[in-house]
Amino acid sequence: MPKYRSFTTTQGRNMSGARSLWRATGMTEKDFTKPIIAVVNSFSQFVPGHIHLQEVGKLICGEIQKSGGVAKEFNTIAIDDGIAMGHSGMLYSLPSRELIADSIEYVVNAHCADAMICISNCDKITPGMLMASLRLNIPSVFISGGPMEAGKIQKNNKTIKIDLVDAIINGGKSHISDDFIKDIEASACPTCGSCSGMFTANSMNCLTEAIGLALPGNGTLLATHIDRKNLFIKSAQIIVKITEDYYKKNNTNVLPRNIANKESFENAMMLDIAMGGSTNTILHLLAAAQEAKVDFKMSNINKLSKKIPHICKVAPSTSLYHVEDVHRAGGVMGILGELNRFNLLHKNTRNILQLNLEETLDEYDIFSTNNPDVINMFQAGPGGIRTTKAYSQNFRWTRLDYDRKNGCIRSCKHAYSQDGGLAILYGNLAKNGCIIKTAGIDAKNYIFSGVAKVYESQEEAASSILNGEIISGDIIVIRYEGPKGGPGMQEMLYPTTYLKSMNLDKTCALITDGRFSGGTSGISIGHISPEAANKGIIALVKNGDIININIPERTIHLNITEKELSHRILQEESKGPLSYKPHSRKRYISSALKAYAFFSTSADQGAVRDYKKISNI
């Protein structure tokens, strides 16, 4: 039977000093026999997805205490990718994932916490916490702050839904009035919560639900709705229960690595493909799988992408639906339920409820459940009131979206396409693979050829787009923006969004060894591996080259001869120390970012640290 880890600091005469310090935090004699549960919060006044989490932390701590645990809260950092976007701040976003994972390991291991509950929400915070939980492998529960309500504006006497991406698109249109832009800007992000589309934050919160480390509703129940409070309370109760199950009953099934096994990762990826989630999720799942010691690679994702239909299309891939609409249609469990009816899922994976997936779907799929509380939860909708307060409104839809032919979630029979919403492409330009969100592309553009225009920074590319230097048929190549070359693998939301501003998003493509925001759509291919800084072929592309993209065949090809390619390699290598480095770019790189670049692997490995380098230190 495992002993509480915390007994290292709470038991025995030689720990009297530690107990004295614990007492100074408010603990009493009775607390020294209870499990110490780390409440890993990510509250921040910088981030709308995290602005409400201070109150959430207090609620969860109180419930843990009531349930028989000792709650000890600490904070991680949190970067808002939307605010950091389009300038040097984005260099820090992806590296913060590793910093978050490390900081959790430091605090939890230094204080010998027995378990942890992770209060996350936005882009790099959820994956950083996920990596930490799988690394530490102690009882863990995830609960996100919840998605933001969609923004709304009046246009042509109609109310239309908008989000952050709409604000960026219109900001890049020179003919749009300042007053209209201000109206959109003031309306796009009306409440606390993670941005309202199926961007990276909401995608990751949906995936933790599918993996089994978060409760049903985690990914889609609005931050502002009163039902979210119930989810926080239940999550706090469950972390105490599974902690006691592990330490008092030796139930190892509740440990993160036993929940997040290979089949669970595949279920999560199948969900991701079915809903056309953010391409960043692939990066984060690959990283998390390495922490879990699970053999899950790009090749596994490629196989899944060919058999999973695309059954849910949400902003930015459509303006019709946001995450609040996914919730009304049954949420993550609704999407998984449709995949399950086509026998596509691993049904024996288990979760923090200690149910297998089949049992969970029986209870939480709106087409299967007999539980009125479940139906009631999925009726939770937007209040339409600007607020930064958590669980502050109680609006409910009178009926759910059961339309599986034309609704927000479709059946596999009525899928948008039988080929999923994400795809992996290979070719001489990406020998180790690259990623495209097919959910955001018109079928007529699945096969695309164009002329390369090469840039060595996203700033340079964005400027060219706005200055009218890009024309239909161009393929913008942005290189040296990978994990090592950036460093930090910036998101290219501004260039792709400016293509929309210039009405070029359907007639141009953009490829990069960087990555994309979850808000990106169009012919946008990222994560090209190897990256330019790792001697990838993208470093050898020249202006005027023809690039061929074929999504049905899963290929991307630089249309030059092998002889020419060999010549370019020799040409680049002749530059000596200056080879495979950007030459036209001026960028300050801090020592922290240099350290990240030194240890980072390419995107096909999740942009995690190269442990071979670490082992040689």
Swiss-Prot record:
SUPFAM superfamilies: IlvD/EDD N-terminal domain-like (SSF143975), LeuD/IlvD-like (SSF52016). Its cofactor is [2Fe-2S] cluster; Mg(2+). One of its GO terms (molecular function) is 2 iron, 2 sulfur cluster binding. Keywords: 2Fe-2S, Amino-acid biosynthesis, Branched-chain amino acid biosynthesis, Iron, Iron-sulfur, Lyase, Magnesium, Metal-binding. Mg(2+) binds at D81, D123, K124, E491. The keyword ATP-binding does not apply. The modification N6-carboxylysine is found at K124. GO terms for cellular component: cytosol. It catalyses: (2R)-2,3-dihydroxy-3-methylbutanoate = 3-methyl-2-oxobutanoate + H2O; (2R,3R)-2,3-dihydroxy-3-methylpentanoate = (S)-3-methyl-2-oxopentanoate + H2O. InterPro entries: Dihydro-acid_dehy_C (IPR042096), DihydroxyA_deHydtase (IPR004404), DiOHA_6PGluconate_deHydtase_CS (IPR020558), ILV_EDD_C (IPR056740), ILV_EDD_N (IPR000581), IlvD/EDD_N (IPR037237). The active site is at S517. Its EC number is 4.2.1.9. Coiled coil: none annotated. Belongs to the IlvD/Edd family. This is Dihydroxy-acid dehydratase. The lineage of its organism: Bacteria, Pseudomonadati, Pseudomonadota, Gammaproteobacteria, Enterobacterales.
